[in-house]
């Protein structure tokens, strides 16, 4: 058994980046979407369920800011909320995602109602938001380090989806384009916080576990979608074909 020790900053960054092997880009559901093998229902299901994640991100970021006592950090972190909620002449990522929904044939009303959000997806996303509320702000902030791997997945969608899914309207891809630069900027900030905060072996190991927790969330979301849209085993499928599960935020 290898003895654990305090990693150098370069070694710790390498350990964080190595977690990319478990990023949800490698999930069979994502692989199918990338390869043009997903059905219209599977694409729509992903867009509708992922919208719950998108609308929860600024709530998560607000929780981090509420727990952070440092104005200089809050001034930089608030940009993440603005990126999603929009400001002045910028529509924001949530609005861009609504247009993605329309581009794949979903109505804004359907997305905003959360009627399509699967319980497994809701539970996973809510676990992320609740972690951000309860953890110390440094740990909650660094849980966003899955952004280390995000530019790759956004670019992959831009490269493959227009070729495979000609029925998706072109303006729907604006969200992915906007996140290419935003994610890279957020990575620089989040990584610098992690390298500064994780100055003990215990903190480094805990942060690696937190990053794995976030990866588990993203993977579990796709597991829920696989059950519903690939295996045709939506919740309560042995009892009813109706979507009887709860469809609103309860907390």
Swiss-Prot record:
Pathway: Cofactor biosynthesis; pyrroloquinoline quinone biosynthesis. The keyword Cell division does not apply. Keywords: Oxidoreductase, PQQ biosynthesis. One of its GO terms (molecular function) is pyrroloquinoline-quinone synthase activity. GO terms for biological process: pyrroloquinoline quinone biosynthetic process; sulfur compound metabolic process. It comes from the Bacteria. Its EC number is 1.3.3.11. The keyword Magnesium does not apply. Pfam families: TENA_THI-4. Gene3D superfamilies: Heme oxygenase-like. InterPro entries: Haem_Oase-like_multi-hlx, PqqC, PqqC-like, Thiaminase-2/PQQC. Transmembrane segments: none annotated. It catalyses: 6-(2-amino-2-carboxyethyl)-7,8-dioxo-1,2,3,4,7,8-hexahydroquinoline-2,4-dicarboxylate + 3 O2 = pyrroloquinoline quinone + 2 H2O2 + 2 H2O + H(+). Ring cyclization and eight-electron oxidation of 3a-(2-amino-2-carboxyethyl)-4,5-dioxo-4,5,6,7,8,9-hexahydroquinoline-7,9-dicarboxylic-acid to PQQ. Belongs to the PqqC family. This is Pyrroloquinoline-quinone synthase. It comes from Cronobacter sakazakii (strain ATCC BAA-894) (Enterobacter sakazakii). The lineage of its organism: Bacteria, Pseudomonadati, Pseudomonadota, Gammaproteobacteria, Enterobacterales.
